[in-house]
Amino acid sequence: MVQGTTSDAGKTTLVAALCRLLAQEGVRVVPFKPQNMALNSAVTADGGEIGRAQALQAVAAGLQPHTDMNPILLKPSSDTGAQVIIHGKARSDMNARDYHAYKPIAMQAVLESYQRLQTQYESVLVEGAGSPAEVNLRERDIANMGFAEAVDCPVILVADIDRGGVFAHIIGTLACLSESERRRTVGFVINRFRGDISLLEPGLKWLEEQTGKPVLAVLPYLHGLFLDAEDAVEHTQAVRGAFRVVVPVPPRISNHTDFDALRAHPEIDLQLVGPGQPIPAADLIILPGSKNTRGDLEWLIANGWREALLRHLRYGGKIIGICGGYQMLGMTVADPHGVEGTPGESAGLGLLDVATELTRDKRLEQVSGVCAFADVGVSGYEIHMGTSDGAARAQPAFLIDGRPEGARSADDQVLGTYLHGLFDTPDACAALLHWAGLNSDVRVDTAQLREASLQRLAAAARPLLAALRALPDYSR
């Protein structure tokens, strides 16, 4: 099991790298994360929903993503509440206190999935969540040492040296663990190192003397990796292209990986705009998905986006709304059942003649079809609770298995769709950008970029695999 001294220490990439290395050797390996908290999720082949990180790790292992790889997914809908997804299906919305009391039941689901994977695969690589040093969350823990103790698996502790304070992070984390948990920790990985390794070696020696545990590997800082991120939204990008794409970043943005292909496009200047930041001029504005459509719609209006969108359209710009962003573009968003919070109805931005009603049932499906405005194929996935209907649906965005999907305005300046991942299909991405005004022969293949990054990760982590196999109690 890989645990980290902090969030974003490198747990996900380390598990992905080890999955790829073992898969290359012919080992039947599978990733597993007991509990994940993220708004960036993926739809599985078995019709469920898991964290984006486990979908990436599945690709690294040469597998189709499956709900057993991430049995508990928490999707925050507010600062104190989240939608609880078990074995790929939404069960209920809970506040933090209620979920803490629910954890023994959640642990049963975790162990069921883990045991199924154990019977099917030679090796199960487990990723922890956050840090095991959160002493306030120790009781009923199912994500870190609580799980490791329950299934009796060894733990590697990874720390990010690029942030600074790496030795304090490791020593401090060990100090917060129980004696049995410290014994379970077999060694450390120092991640994202850049510089002269000889200058680090005295510190490594000191760490091993202080803890009695080995530093298993020092992994380099790898620039330019193209991998799916779960939570951190990258707000900055070097300005390269002349075609300006602007995306607002509301508090509950979801599935921001929709924009990864645009970030990699050499002719696009992608700008993600957070609260309080000036809204720049754009050729294309994209409203992203949201875990709280009405709340994020209120945020957009309060931050001046309604006026910015109207001005953008007056000057001939184009707008795309994805999932929650599509719902916001319509006339109204109704939540009669309180799916996302207090029941009620909100006026939309009024840029598409559709009305949305949020429903308790969630649609989860991988889909494919063609663009309604260009003769090219498209594929992606749907994750949403709600339906949208109205006159604008007569001019759809896509045809999915022959059925109309999404909507376009009468003047063809505004497009809305429930389809996530729509830019990941190279030809569909080019067609959408052409619709928005960019005539380019460039094709960005996100799958190819991701594969190259996984290969780089695996090559960098090979010394770690050798070190693990040299441990006395290591077993594949």
Swiss-Prot record:
Entry keyword Glycoprotein? no
Q: Which cysteines are joined by disulfide bonds?
A: none
GATase cobBQ-type domain ranges (all copies): 242-428
Annotated metabolic or biological route of this protein = Cofactor biosynthesis; adenosylcobalamin biosynthesis
**Could you tell me the superkingdom of the organism this chain comes from?**
Bacteria
Question: What InterPro entries does the annotation carry?
Answer: Class_I_gatase-like, CobQ/CobB/MinD/ParA_Nub-bd_dom, CobQ_GATase1, CobQ_N, CobQ_synth, GATase_3, P-loop_NTPase
Biological process according to GO: cobalamin biosynthetic process
- GO MF, any single term: ABC-type vitamin B12 transporter activity
Active site residues per record: C323 (nucleophile), H420
Which keywords are on file for this protein? Answer: Cobalamin biosynthesis, Glutamine amidotransferase
Q: Which PANTHER family match?
A: COBYRIC ACID SYNTHASE, DETHIOBIOTIN SYNTHETASE
Q: Which family does it belong to?
A: Belongs to the CobB/CobQ family. CobQ subfamily.
State the HAMAP family in the record: CobQ
Provide the function of this protein.
Catalyzes amidations at positions B, D, E, and G on adenosylcobyrinic A,C-diamide. NH(2) groups are provided by glutamine, and one molecule of ATP is hydrogenolyzed for each amidation.
Any idea what this protein is called?
Cobyric acid synthase
Q: Which organism is it from?
A: Janthinobacterium sp. (strain Marseille) (Minibacterium massiliensis)
Cite the source lineage.
Answer: Bacteria, Pseudomonadati, Pseudomonadota, Betaproteobacteria, Burkholderiales
Quote the gene name from the UniProt entry: cobQ
